[in-house]
């Protein structure tokens, strides 16, 4: 693990243009290969002996994922992402298992390690934020920790703005993992338990304070156009988080109608960012998965939850401009988003979707050959229970 982390540092420094001797880069690549082989061997031995340490496997997945991203190896990055996600889904006992799981389908991962340890909240949140659908892993919570976010009196740098938002998002996802299960989706018919209501109000207040401090920072500190674009990206993710935390505990999805202005802002700002990014892409040297996940998530969020047909289609159309090659490119994810919209609208294309037509708990997996995507979703039947929908979509 140490070798892998050292390799990440050396590779990233060389890509940022810092003085990095060739022998250092060669060493880092050599050590990352050693780390990959060693971690793979350890996990294989654990599987063979039925003694999987989920912490080692998860950390190995996230560290090796980072190395593959820096090397531009999308297939390798997705392999590690799917493996880590599979472990978390197995532990949380939530939703369908993704392809590429570590171990056979009927294998139960060892629970010798405490799955609710505070120190692994960040790792679990990382897998949520790396998935396009932002899978919540409900049930894997921090065992009572409030996961207090960081919010300074004022922001001096854009890094401080980003780090503060990241800490608030981490706190939000830990809160949702602990309290976001179906039995607490009772608003507006019933009040939330006091402990949940207090945590919710505290998070909402923190988000609002962050937004206020961001506005001051933009007015007093931002001078360069590039920094203004980076700040816009953070603003989009704030808007998504604000809608998410404000709707988590509602019994039906009609509540999203109260956030049409936020959905509109998300789409409009995302369009500006993507247009700027596409103009600069030819000279960009930044390593990334082929789908620019920072902008794909907000657009997928709008297509998934908004009921306004025109806004949903604007989001899908712009999503097609995000990324052009590889497995998880904008066009393939847009096909999935379009299927969601068409399935919900049925014969009423372009109109607001009725509650009984909404899809729930949507997850998807794009196959390694990038030709087919498997989509899972739930849909309420006349008895109020969820029927599972399983659909395979052709992507070409």
What label would you give each PLM region?
Residues 31, 38, 80, 262, ...:
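Alpha-helical solenoid repeat scaffolds, predominantly canonical TPR units
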Residues 197-266:
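Long, well-ordered mid-to-C-terminal structural blocks that present hydrophobic/aromatic surfaces
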């Amino acid at each position: 693990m140490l070798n892998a982390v050292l390799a990440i540092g050396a590779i990233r420094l060389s890509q940022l243009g810092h003085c990095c001797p060739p022998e250092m880069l060669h060493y880092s690549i050599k050590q990352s290969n050693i780390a990959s082989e060693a971690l793979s061997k350890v996990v294989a031995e654990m599987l063979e002996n039925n003694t999987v340490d989920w912490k080692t496997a998860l950390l190995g997945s996230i560290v090796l994922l980072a190395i593959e991203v820096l090397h531009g190896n999308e297939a390798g990055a997705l392999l590690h992402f799917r493996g880590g996600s599979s472990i978390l889904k197995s532990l949380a006992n939530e939703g369908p298992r993704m392809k590429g799981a570590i171990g056979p389908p009927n294998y139960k991962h060892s629970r010798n390690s405490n799955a609710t340890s505070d120190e692994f909240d960040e790792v679990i949140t990382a897998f949520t934020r790396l998935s396009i659908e932002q899978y919540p892993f409900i049930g894997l919570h921090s065992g009572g920790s409030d996961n207090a976010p960081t919010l300074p009196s004022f922001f001096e740098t854009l890094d401080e703005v980003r780090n503060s938002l990241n800490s608030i998002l981490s706190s939000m996802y830990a809160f949702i993992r602990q309290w976001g299960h179906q039995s607490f989706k009772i608003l507006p018919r019933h009040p939330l338990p006091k402990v949940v209501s207090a945590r919710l109000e505290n998070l909402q207040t923190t988000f609002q304070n962050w937004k206020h401090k961001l506005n001051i920072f933009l007015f007093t500190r931002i001078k360069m156009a590039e920094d203004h674009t980076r700040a816009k990206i953070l603003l989009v993710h704030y808007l998504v988080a604000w809608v998410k935390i404000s709707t988590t505990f509602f019994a039906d999805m009609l509540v999203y109608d109260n956030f049409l202005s936020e959905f509109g802002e998300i789409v409009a700002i995302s369009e500006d960012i993507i247009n700027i990014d596409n103009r600069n892409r030819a000279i960009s040297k930044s390593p990334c998965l082929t789908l620019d996940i920072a902008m794909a998530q907000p657009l997928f969020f709008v297509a998934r939850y908004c009921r306004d047909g025109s806004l949903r289609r604007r989001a899908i159309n712009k999503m097609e401009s995000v990324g052009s090659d590889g497995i998880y490119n904008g066009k393939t994810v847009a096909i999935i988003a379009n299927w969601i919209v068409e399935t919900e609208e049925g014969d009423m294309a372009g109109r607001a979707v009725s509650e009984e037509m909404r899809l729930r708990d949507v997850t998807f997996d794009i196959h390694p050959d990038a030709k087919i995507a498997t989509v899972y979703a739930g849909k309420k039947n006349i008895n109020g229970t969820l029927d599972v929908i399983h659909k395979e979509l052709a992507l070409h």
